[in-house]
């Protein structure tokens, strides 16, 4: 627990192990960008067209009127804030540096992949459906946390699956293509906490990376910090009220043979305010074979990616070292070559 950032006194200066060279943390453009906002209560034809257009252009978009109630969203945000303010002793049993442990509290302070560490603490939970007895493996404090997590994850999962159906309709493939093993793995919940940082210009909450799953929904919280790679620059994201920020994972890129891209993004820190966000990852099962769908292949458009078992992809992804660009995956095709 001594590595947990939020459990230690506020730092007056940034420890050397967290300092990145300036060329590794290029500043974002000054403009703050509002990602495309898609109202899921609009007509279905309009919604699926908007999702596909936004996905092709930026790989990121926002959804509103998505079906997750404002109360559920506020309850989740409130519970997460309370969790990170609990005394260290109440969280000690959750702390683990074992990456393969499904439910754990960990810190970027223990990651030394590229020589530097990351200014983030994270509570990661595996959420199978139906939840059943798995709920007993989640934290039970603050009181009511388990029920809030179950309700939030169930509703967010439903939104993710509906977005996948809309994408299928927009691309002209079978609407239930992503049902079953492709989206049937445990939903992974990352509750990220970025404490206030004494020198945010030289630190990273998370390095540039692409998500390894199918599709991700982010509850971004009240403090901005997400930045997205776009046309060679980093753009700051200004989330809309009560919206989820959505991005495509690498498995969606593989299935669509590159039609939809998984885009690099990073998390920055703030000198005055702590930031808490909640990422919901829709995952394939570990045994799922994932490759380009035949609907996206032709003589003129051969497969760009191999068909691999998701378990093998995850195994290689977890050991890929950071390159000079700080891209955790370096290149999706290169990761596949190692399998």
Swiss-Prot record:
Post-translational modification: The N-terminus is blocked.
Single GO cellular component term: cytoplasm
Cofactor(s) required for function per UniProt: Fe(2+); L-ascorbate
Domain Fe2OG dioxygenase residues, every copy: 184-284
InterPro entries found in the cross-reference section: DIOX_N, IPNS-like_FE2OG_OXY, IPNS-like_sf, Oxoglu/Fe-dep_dioxygenase_dom, Plant_2OG-oxidoreductases
Binding sites annotated in the UniProt record for 2-oxoglutarate: 275
GO molecular function, one term: metal ion binding
Resulting phenotype, residue 117 to R: In strain: cv. Igri
EC number: 1.14.11.24
GO biological process: response to iron(III) ion
Outcome recorded upon mutating residue 308 to I: In strain: cv. Igri
Keyword Transport: no
Top-rank EC class of the record's enzyme: oxidoreductase
Subcellular localization: Cytoplasm
Conditions for induction: Up-regulated by iron deficiency and down-regulated by iron. Not induced by anaerobic conditions.
Cofactor note: Binds 1 Fe(2+) ion per subunit.
Record: residues binding Fe cation: 209, 211, 265
Effect of residue 11 to P: In strain: cv. Ehimehadaka No.1
Catalytic activity: 2'-deoxymugineate + 2-oxoglutarate + O2 = mugineate + succinate + CO2
Assigned protein family: Belongs to the iron/ascorbate-dependent oxidoreductase family.
Function: Involved in the biosynthesis of mugineic acid family of phytosiderophores. Hydroxylates the C-2' positions of 2'-deoxymugineic acid (DMA) and 3-epihydroxymugineic acid (epiHDMA). May be involved in boron tolerance.
Protein name as catalogued: 2'-deoxymugineic-acid 2'-dioxygenase
Organism: Hordeum vulgare (Barley)
């Amino acid at each position: 627990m001594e590595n947990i950032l939020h459990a230690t006194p506020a730092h007056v200066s940034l420890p050397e192990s967290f300092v990145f060279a300036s060329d590794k943390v290029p500043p974002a453009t000054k403009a703050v960008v509002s990602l495309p906002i898609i109202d899921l209560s609009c007509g279905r034809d309009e919604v699926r067209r908007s999702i596909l257009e936004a996905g092709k252009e930026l790989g990121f978009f926002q959804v509103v009127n998505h079906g997750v109630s404002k109360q559920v969203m506020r309850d989740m945000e409130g519970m997460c804030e309370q969790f990170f303010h609990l005394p260290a002793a109440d969280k000690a049993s959750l702390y683990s540096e074992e990456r393969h442990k499904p439910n754990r509290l960990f810190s970027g302070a223990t990651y030394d992949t590229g020589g530097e560490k990351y200014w983030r603490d994270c509570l990661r939970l595996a959420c199978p459906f139906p939840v059943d007895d798995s709920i007993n493996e989640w934290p039970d404090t603050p009181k009511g946390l388990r029920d809030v997590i179950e309700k939030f994850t169930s509703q967010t999962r439903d939104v993710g699956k509906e977005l996948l159906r809309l994408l299928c309709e927009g691309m002209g493939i079978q609407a239930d293509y992503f049902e079953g093993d492709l989206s049937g793995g445990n939903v992974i919940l990352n509750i990220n906490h970025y404490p206030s940082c004494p020198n945010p210009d030289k630190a990273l909450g998370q390095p540039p990376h692409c998500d390894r799953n199918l599709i991700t929904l982010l509850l971004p919280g009240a403090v901005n910090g997400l930045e997205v790679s776009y046309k060679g620059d980093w753009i700051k994201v200004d989330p809309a009220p009560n919206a989820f920020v959505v991005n495509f994972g690498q498995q969606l890129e593989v299935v669509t043979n590159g039609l939809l891209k998984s885009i690099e993004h990073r998390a920055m820190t703030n000198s005055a305010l702590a930031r808490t966000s909640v990422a919901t990852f829709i995952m394939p099962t570990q045994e799922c074979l994932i490759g380009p769908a035949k609907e996206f292949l032709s003589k003129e458009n051969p497969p760009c990616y191999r068909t691999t078992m998701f378990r093998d992809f995850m195994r290689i992804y977890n050991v890929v070292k950071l390159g000079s660009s700080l891209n955790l995956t370096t290149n999706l095709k290169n990761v596949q070559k190692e399998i």
